[in-house]
Amino acid sequence: MGQKINPTGLRVGIIKDWESRWFADKDYADLLHEDYVVREYIEKRLKDASVSKVEIERAANRLNISLHTAKPGMVIGKGGSEIETLRTDITNLAKGKRVHVNVVEVKNPDAVAKLVAENIARQLEGRVSFRRAMKQSIQRSMRSGIKGIKTEVSGRLGGADIARSEKYSEGTVPLHTLRADIDYGTAEADTTYGKIGVKVWLHHGEVLPTKKAASNEQ
């Protein structure tokens, strides 16, 4: 089971929190679709800004969005012009709700699965050998202090006629252990031979229950 399911979804409510945090008695479907549209817009507009995570919180007629990025300067823009345009566009998508955008800098992009996957995808688009791209990313991530990493690329690797998958890993990545902090990220590389999918799993160690949580269970 742990090998197949999305590691983040499996651990939500156990050691991971939701990325959309709000409650609705009615209009739930509309608000959920609004979240999807906003996330899709941010992903397209900030494709090159190394955005690893988008968190959305709602309160009354207000939308609070936290953007986790390795390139905050690109998101904010000169004199805050880019983030103001972003806020205006999201306000239109959110049907006039008040929008607040908070930018959170990612200090160590080599320890974030989404950014590692995007880096491998960029190298594949630049015609770098997939083996070299994966091995270099694994080495950089292991130097950043993580416990383990697993990478997988799928598609017409090296321009082969038949699509296949290749995996490389180092360290430990216990996907069945629910207390293991597994970060999972995906990306796509658009090459001349078609799309190549990239998946990355990072193991940051085990999250042990706090004393308060342990006492509640007892």
UniProtKB/Swiss-Prot annotation:
Keywords in alphabetical order: Ribonucleoprotein, Ribosomal protein, RNA-binding, rRNA-binding
Name of a matching Pfam family: Ribosomal_S3_C
SMART domains: KH
Record's GO cellular component terms: cytosolic small ribosomal subunit
Any one Gene Ontology BP term: translation
Domain KH type-2 as annotated: residue spans: 38-107
Coiled-coil region(s): none
Record GO terms (molecular function): mRNA binding; rRNA binding; structural constituent of ribosome
Role of this protein: Binds the lower part of the 30S subunit head. Binds mRNA in the 70S ribosome, positioning it for translation.
Family as reported in the entry's similarity comment: Belongs to the universal ribosomal protein uS3 family.
Assembly information from the UniProt record: Part of the 30S ribosomal subunit. Forms a tight complex with proteins S10 and S14.
Name of the protein this chain belongs to: Small ribosomal subunit protein uS3
Species whose genome carries this gene: Exiguobacterium sibiricum (strain DSM 17290 / CCUG 55495 / CIP 109462 / JCM 13490 / 255-15)
The gene coding this protein: rpsC
